[in-house]
Amino acid sequence: ACFIRNCPKGGKRNVDEGPTKPCMFCSFGQCVAPHTCCGEKGCEMGTVDANMCQEENESPIPCHVFGKRCLLNHPGNSHGNCVTYGICCSHDTCTVHLACM
């Protein structure tokens, strides 16, 4: 996964073809979106700590989120990662997901 502004020239589909780095860490886990921090205890969205994740947008190298892949039923964005027990997130949404349990 990559954040919105730091995707490679060809878009998100080209992330696997170029260099990536792990997304930055936040207060209790990993940044999974510009305003979302997830870890073992769940996810925070829009908090002061989670908003620090928007710094990832300044990096020219796309980042990848740890966790196995999961599919979301979300128009235009069906690929996500299991970011904590039972939660699948993409760059713009998180949802409860059985594949992440």
Swiss-Prot record:
Residue positions assigned to the propeptide: 11-18
Q: List the disulfide bonds.
A: C2-C7, C23-C63, C26-C37, C31-C53, C38-C43, C70-C88, C82-C100, C89-C94
Show the GO cellular component annotation of the record.
extracellular space; secretory granule
Q: Which residues are annotated as modified residue Glycine amide in the UniProt record?
A: G10
Q: Which residues form the signal peptide?
A: 1
Instruction: Answer whether the UniProt record assigns the keyword Membrane to this protein.
Output: no
Q: Which GO terms describe its molecular function?
A: neurohypophyseal hormone activity; toxin activity
Q: Which InterPro entries does its entry note? A: Neurhyp_horm, Neurhyp_horm_dom_sf, Neurohypophysial_hormone_CS
Q: In which tissues is it expressed?
A: Expressed by the venom gland.
| Location (main, coarse) | secreted
What else does the entry mention about this protein?
A: The letter 'K' in the name 'Conopressin-K' proposed by Kumar and colleagues stands for the eighth residue, which differs between conopressins.
Matching entries from PANTHER family are given as: ISOTOCIN, NEUROPHYSIN
The family classification in the record reads: Belongs to the vasopressin/oxytocin family.
- Entry text on domains: The cysteine framework of the conopressin is C-C.
Protein name, as recorded = Conopressin/conophysin, isoform 3
The organism encoding this protein is Conus monile (Necklace cone)
